[in-house]
Amino acid sequence: MLTEEEFLKKFGENIREFREERSMTIDELSIITGIRAQYLKRIELGTAKRLSVDHVFIFADAFNLKPHEIVKGL
């Protein structure tokens, strides 16, 4: 089982991977999701402390994925 720190780091890596696969910038993802670019950077770095299930659904919608695909490997 992952620690909270490991979970946040892996979640952030997944988000960065999905964003880069789509050649999106942080600013573009910010516009699509309504999440501030600065906070998106912290999510990708694994340093954001306030993630919720809502974030999974927001990112799934932004990347046109199913929610379980966002948390792959977690």
Predicted ranges, named:
Residues 21-22, 32, 62:
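Residues within the alpha-helical elements of helix-turn-helix
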Residues 1-21:
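A short, Lys/Arg-rich alpha-helix, primarily the initiator
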Residues 54-69:
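DNA major-groove recognition helix of helix-turn-helix/homeodomain DNA-binding modules
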Residues 35-50:
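Recognition helix of helix-turn-helix/homeodomain-like DNA-binding domains
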Residues 28-30, 59:
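Short alpha-helical "recognition helix" segments of helix-turn-helix
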Residues 15, 29, 40-43, 70:
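Conserved hydrophobic/aromatic packing and binding residues within compact polymer-binding modules
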Residues 13, 23-24, 51-54:
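Residue-level signal for the short linker/turn that defines the boundary of a DNA-recognition helix
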